[in-house]
Every structure is written in C-alpha cells, then in structure tokens.
Amino acid sequence: MFTLKQVINKSIQTSMKNGVMSSAVKRSFSTVGGINQPKSRKELSESFLDGTSSTYVEDMFANWVKDPKSVHPSWASFFESSERGVPAGEAFMSPPTLGSSVATKATPSTYTSSGSPKQVSDSMRLLLLVRAYQVRGHALANLDPLGLEVKEEPAEFNPAKYGFTEADMDRPIFVGEGFISGFLTNKQPETTLRQVLKRLKETYCGDIGIEYMHIQDREMCDWIRDKFETSQPVEIPDKEKIKILERLSWADQFEGFLGLKYRATRRFGLDGCESLIPGMKAMIDTATEDGVESIVLGMPHRGRLNVLANVVRKPLPAIFNEFNGGVISIEGEYSATGDVKYHLGTSYDRVTSSGKKVHLSLVANPSHLEAVNPLVEGKVRAKQHYSKDTEQKKSMAVQLHGDASVAGQGVVYETLHLSNLDNYSTGGTVHIVVNNQIGFTTNPKYSRSSKYCTDVAKTIDIPVFHVNGDNVEAVVKVCKIAAEWRQKFKRDVFVDIVCYRKHGHNETDQPKFTQPIMYDKIGKQQPIIEKYSNKLIAEKVITQEQYLQMKNIIHESYEKGYQDGMKHVPNAEDWLESRWEGFKSPIELGNPGRTGIDQDLLQKIGKVLYTEPSGFEVHSTIKRLLKEKKDMFDKGTGFDWATAEALAFGSLLLDGNHVRLSGQDVERGTFSHRHAVWHDQKTDQTYAPLTKLATALGKKDAAEFVASNSSLSEFAVLGFELGYSLENPDALILWEAQFGDFSNGAQVIIDQFISSGEQKWMRQSGLTMLLPHGYDGAGPEHSSCRIERYLQLCDSDPNKIPPKEEAERKQSQHCNMQVLNCSTPVNYFHALRRQVHRDFRKPLVIATPKYLLRYEKSFSTAKEFSNDSFTRLYPEAFPDQINKPEKINRIVFCTGQVYYNLIASRESNNIKDVAIIRVEQLHPFPFDLVAEQLQHYPNAKAIWCQEEPMNMGYWNYIYPYFISTFKHINRPADITYTGRPSSASPAVASHTLHKLQLENFLSNALTGQVGSK
C-alpha cells in the first residue's frame, strides 16, 4: 500500500504523460504570502499535494488504507481513483459553482455509484478555507492592545473565493466522522460553513496569532493544530484564574511600589507588559512538571527587576538595598566595581505551586542587547553535560528579547543557528519577546524590513505564537504550550507578547517627543490589572473584597522588603554557585599547582595518541604523522605543538577535568596540525584518540573530551563557550579562532564579558582563547589577532610593582585576564594545565603560532614536560655562544615567533654582543623577571623588538612597564623600539615587501643599523 503522496505522485505522472499537468501541482498557493484562488478542478485537488496543506486529507487517507469503509464513499472513490493513477486533477468533478469556465468531464473510472463528487468538492473547498486561516489567520489576529494598525481581511478568507455563497453558510457539508483531529473532532460526519468559520476566527484571529505552517515536519504541525483547533474554546478553571490574577497583581504592584519609592530612578519597568510575569511563571510550572530541574534565563533591562523579584524570587531586601545604593564590601569580600541594578544576575532555588523544586539562574549581562544569548545556551549545555542529561529534559534555556533587538541584532540569528548542531544544541529554547512596538524612539517600520520582529524564527523551522499582552489568559496559554513544545520536540519556540511601554525608554524619558499618537493612546489605556480583575469580578470568580485583600497582602510584603532592605548586608557568596565553593577571590592568595607530568604518564598518553585503531582506514598523511609521533616518544625529542597540546588535554582528562575545544575547523586545525579527530577514508566514521584514554588506561573517573567544529560564527560561538565555562571551574574550555584576525567578530563578548565580567558581576571564568597570530607574509587579513587590543583591556597598573616574593601569585589573582605568546610547545602545555591546576580562574588569551607549528627548532623534549610550572620569561637560551654578560651591548626583549627570526639573524651574522630574551607572559607583566635580566646585563642597551607595526602589537603596552622596572632597579629609563613602522593596515600584501621589512627591523634590533633598502 502506498502513502498518499506516492498515490498522488503516481496520478501526477499520468497527468504529465497526458499533457494535462497543472502548474498548481508545483504550488497552488504560498504557505507564507497568501493563497491564490484555484482556477480549475485540477488545481483544487492538487492544492493538497503541498507539504502541510494535505493535513486533513492525509488523515482520511490513512484511515481509508486501514478500512475503506471508514471514510465516506465519495472520499473512498477519490482515493481509489488516485491510487489507480487517474490524473490528480481528474479524480473528482467540481460542481459548476467552482471553475465553471473549465470543462469538467470525468472519466467513467473516476466514480462509483455510492460516491458523490460534490461532497468531495465541498470538503476540499472547505479544507482549503481552513488552511487559509491556518497559514494567514495571524494577519487578522487582534494582537495590538493599542489598536495602532488598521487591518484588512485577507482576500483568501472570503468564502466566495472557494465557490461558496451565502446560501451555503448553513448547508451541511460532509467532513467525515471521528477520524480527523482539529476542528472536526465533534464526532459529527457533517458541519456547516458558519460553524467552521466561527471557530476559525476564534482560534486564528482572536488574541493569539499562530505561525506554524512554514514548518516542514508534519508531526509538529499536527501537534500545534491539535493544541489550538479544539472543537470548542477551552475554559480555564476558576482556581487557575485566581492564580493568574495574583501573579499579575504581584507584577503590577512591584512597578507601582518602585515608582512610588524611587520616582527619579531608572528601573526600565514592565508597565504595559505585566502579563509577562504570570506567563513566565506558568511556563516554568509547566516545564517543571515535565521534568525540568534547572532553567537559565537571559534577558535585557526591560522588566528585569520584576523578573528577578517575582519569577526568580531574588529576596526583596536585596533588590531594595541595591536601589538604596548598597554595595558589597570591597575590602572584605571582593574587588568588584559592580553594575547597575538592571544588569545584575542571580541564582535561586524556587518551589513551584505543585511543590517541585527548580533552580533558576538569571545570567548577568551588559547593555549590549542580545549579547547574552549565546552565554545562556552555553551555560545550559554545560549543565546538561555535567548532569549527564543526554535527553536534554532537565535543563532548559529561556531567552527574553525586545522587539527591536530581536530583529536588529545579528547575534540572535547566530545563536539560533546553533540550536540544532550536535555539540551546541540545548534541546530547545523558549524565546519570549516583550514587544512594546518601539525601539527606544524608533518605530518598527524603521527598525525592521519584515512584518514581524520574530521572522528570524522561520529560518530554523520553529513556531511563533503572537499574543495580545492585555489578554493575560492568552499569554499564560501560549507560554504553557511553548514549554510543552520544547519538552516534546526539543526545538526552539517563540512567544511574541505584543504590548506597550507605559513610560519612555526609562522612567525619566519623555516619549511624546517622538511618539505623540502612540502615547496619547497609552495615556488612555486601562491597565491590564484593572481589565482582568474587573473581568473576574464580573464572572464572580472573585469578589471585590477578596481582590482588595489580595492587593493589601502584596503591598505589605513589598513594604516589609523595603524596610528590611535598609538593614540588608550584601554578600559575595550570594553570587557564587556551589560548584565554585572554595575558589579564591582576587584579593585572596591561592596556591599555584604543579603543571608538569611524570614521564611514565607522558608515555602512556603518547601511546594512545599514536596508535592506529584496527579496522580503521586513516589518511596516508596521518599514518605518516602517527609514525613521526611514535618516534618522538621513543626518542624523547621533537615534541611539536599539536603533541604538546594533546598531552595537556590528555593529562587533564585523566585528572578528571573536562576538556572542550570549539571553533571553526578545530578538529583538524586550520593549519592541518592538530588532527584531534580522524576520518575513516572508506566509511567516513570518526575516531578521536583522546576520547579513548579512559578505556586504554583503565581510568573510570577520566573526564570527557570534546573537539567540535563550530558554525562560521565568532560572536555566538565564543559567547557559547564563555557561558559553558561559567558553569563548572573543573574544566578547560577553549575557543580557537580560525585565524586570530577574525576574533574581532566577537569583540562584544571580549569587551563586555571576558575582560570585565569578573569585576562587574563577580563571575570567574577560565575560558581560554587560542588566536593564531604571526607575520608570515600572508597579508593584512591573516597576520594579526590584534593583540594590542587585548593588552589594552588588561587592568594592571604599570606603576605598581608587587613585592618580589608574591609577584606571580598576587599578580595572577589581581588581574582581570592573562595574555601570553608562547615560543615553545612545552610552555604552551604548561600554560594550558595552569588554567586548571590552581584555585582561581582567569580568562586566558594566547597568541598561538602558525609557521612554528612545523618549525623543528621550536620543538621541545620529553623531559621538559616534567618541569614544575609555566615559564613567564625565557632568559638567553645560548649564553655560551655570546659574550659574557658585562660585554653584552644590546639586550633584545621580544615575544612569540619573532624570537626565531632574531636567533637566525644573530647566528648568520655572527653577532656576539646581543642577548635575546623572550617574554612569554605579557599580562600580568613579569616585573621581577625583567628586572633580573636588566641587572644581569648591566651595560646593555634595552631594545623591544616586534614583528607588528609600531602602533600595534606590544610596544605601547609594554613601554610603561619597562619604564617602571628601570626606575625600580635605579637604572636610567631607556628602551628603544624596533619593528615595522606604524600602519593603518596590520600587514603588507606583498611577500617581497614583507621580507624586506623583516630584514630591516631584525638588523636594526641586533646592530642598530637598518638593513639593505
């Protein structure tokens, strides 16, 4: 037996052979842009071949397959004819009222004596009308509480378009009995056009507008249809209505209370969209009942305080204390600058109305709208990883958006684009848009090119529920359905609450400067709480006295919270989650851990790295690399960068620390050096050696390794990994840029979160950024990670030199982040392990090499991996090949790969009076070690050499640090720059000019003379 599609396709093929193929087969109407009137009987039936348009007919076909007698004879005749290959447009005959200008002769084989072609025609025309509402009903929905837009009824809603007249409104139309869901669930074989139109308008053109017919998955469409297309409107129990009223009252009075107590304070209130609070709480209740134990929320400033108070349940005294200017003691707790109250985050355990517990986390965020989106997703993904929530049912993300920002900010799409990727999916996110129909002072027609602010949702095949924010029951309904959708399908969903903003952008703003008409209407608008309380009183759900009593109880709670807030003492512990207990704050001194590993462990890890699995056909080049890797472990020399990295990862995994590497092309590596994941050349199966460590070495407690190629996004993916790193300190989370040059695509994450997040929000992160950097003649777009920008973001004071005995520990914990440029694989190894083996966390930025990846003179020995710790500064590596320290005339300080250019040039020119020093850690600056080198060469002139232009790279950063160091050791402050001249572009495009520049500044650094011109 065939499916309906196969049956109809067979009849289409017959139509094509007979030359009667209608263009309507391809598409008789658009699922988004409206419906074109079918012009013939063929078009009428063929309309059902299009995706979700065949919903009802497919239901009947499925029943006909099981039992031909279960459907009306007219439909049985239609299916039977189609299965025999009768052309799709000839399987029934339309009545004269539809397409009468077209000849409509049916072949004798089309009908049986018991079948009525008119009944099939009636059914089809009715179902086309139903589908018109399914597709476009939202266009006529009553969504705007202000009624700013005058809507015209779409032409496809006119029954006359389908051949119906007023005389047909109450005429019985056959639809089937009991086997079709949706509107037709009343067990009646017939209905009337009037009845169906009534329910269509109630369902699709009421206070809820549903966009779902763009979704390609039939089951998903059916599920949504069944939720809304009930035969009768679903009544809400009185108990539920009272709960909604109470929650709405808490939201309303919160804004009123703040407005009364803090009249001149900006709070970015929720006035005009108070229904968000009962909607969110209903969504959380529904999700929790379905197994959700943890919810991470991300949201902008609008309504944030109300959500903190009434959804997350942050204690009221803490909120009011912040309004009163309360801050955490800097000396006693944490060196934090803090942030405005409507940016702050928090975490609390909440008990739902049914008694179930759910952990709620609101992620702190900056004013950069939507920038927090990927962090929320990353944090949820981490929760799912650590709780082994493989079904993604226990932890859920909820994102709140503004209408202007959700349409305008590109990171929204970048984050949505991660939603179905294997290593980034969180099993669906509930998105709620507080759509107050304005962006600061800009009207929607100037801030987006699409009809709805949520149209980005259609790119990933998810539903959008638009809802009138003044109908709090409708808001609650769609929020519940959104939670159910997420739990069932593990896909995102949007709830678009169309509302208004009672005040200006903030409470001190004058909105009538730019929106006089809108704010005239808002001024006359009856508050939501009044509308709903009056409704329930009129319905006798609650009395006026009971409602006043409810209001008084809520007001007393806010007043008590306000009074207690006067005495509230903030504590940094309120900001830290349990996994971070025991980690040191910036003003506490932690103990640096040993980063070296013993040689036996090194060899064991190595064997896993170079062993080819049986039955797995690796690429011939990788076979050669594996042989080379085995040789390096056998000989104890020649350890390259990829091997050093793998040893760091492997040893951390065996210590129980999760390692996650993410970014564009990271599995192989941009420069084909890493090969963390192998591909079978015959089956395309994959194999990641580091995932086999636990089994190979019998370590049951070894952690999981993940290397994952990401989407081609910097902003969202870096934000995702940052969010991931916030969840658990016992992990090494890395993001690698394809080239360091492209990292500025994530500049907002770097500026607003990574460099300043700890100081603003007391949230530590050990996120590591790997930024390929180096001047190899590849031109201006593939040379520089803009390292100067990271150094500019560093917060150390170049005029304050810490005591020598505590220099490294104090500097490391006081700084906001670390910036390195390692010159050896082994130091890179130690840097990675250091990230985890200490009791505090700091973001780490590493300018990683490119040509050094295969440069043997940079490689390390096996013994060096057993050294105790990371080396912040390398002294002269070949003291026996140059003069005695007092005879050294020039001491050249540098960092990164230019060191090897300097060494090669010094050797080829037989220069003996120059010492070359490598600064591996740029920030925190190693004052103590630089001072030792300057004192070791008392007669040498200090030079700073870099391959970057003078206005880029390290020079402007390191200069004041060197000056302070000179002063500290009582030596005349004198250091000279050598490198490329200042430039607007990071690098030249000409390889010839690149080499000439290199020769010139190397000569200048080593001799004081510019090379050949």
From Swiss-Prot:
Reactions catalysed: N(6)-[(R)-lipoyl]-L-lysyl-[protein] + 2-oxoglutarate + H(+) = N(6)-[(R)-S(8)-succinyldihydrolipoyl]-L-lysyl-[protein] + CO2
Stretch forming the transit peptide: 1-39
Entry keyword annotation includes Amino-acid biosynthesis: no
Single GO MF descriptor: thiamine pyrophosphate binding
GO annotation terms (biological process): glycolytic process; tricarboxylic acid cycle
GO cellular component: mitochondrial matrix; mitochondrion; oxoglutarate dehydrogenase complex
EC number annotated for this UniProt entry: 1.2.4.2
One Pfam entry name: Transket_pyr
Cofactor: thiamine diphosphate; Mg(2+)
Principal subcellular localisation of the protein: mitochondrion
Protein residues bound to Mg(2+): 403, 436, 438
Classification via InterPro entries: 2-oxogl_dehyd_N, 2oxoglutarate_DH_E1, DH_E1, KGD_C_sf, ODO-1/KGD_C, THDP-binding, Transketolase-like_Pyr-bd
First-tier enzyme category under EC: oxidoreductase
UniProt entry keywords in alphabetical sequence: Glycolysis, Magnesium, Metal-binding, Mitochondrion, Oxidoreductase, Thiamine pyrophosphate, Transit peptide
Localisation per UniProt entry: Mitochondrion matrix
Binding site for thiamine diphosphate: 302, 403, 436, 438, 664
Family according to the record: Belongs to the alpha-ketoglutarate dehydrogenase family.
Function: The 2-oxoglutarate dehydrogenase complex catalyzes the overall conversion of 2-oxoglutarate to succinyl-CoA and CO(2). It contains multiple copies of three enzymatic components: 2-oxoglutarate dehydrogenase (E1), dihydrolipoamide succinyltransferase (E2) and lipoamide dehydrogenase (E3).
PANTHER family: 2-OXOADIPATE DEHYDROGENASE COMPLEX COMPONENT E1 (PTHR23152:SF4), 2-OXOGLUTARATE DEHYDROGENASE (PTHR23152)
Quaternary structure (record): Homodimer. Component of the 2-oxoglutarate dehydrogenase complex.
Name of this chain's protein: 2-oxoglutarate dehydrogenase, mitochondrial
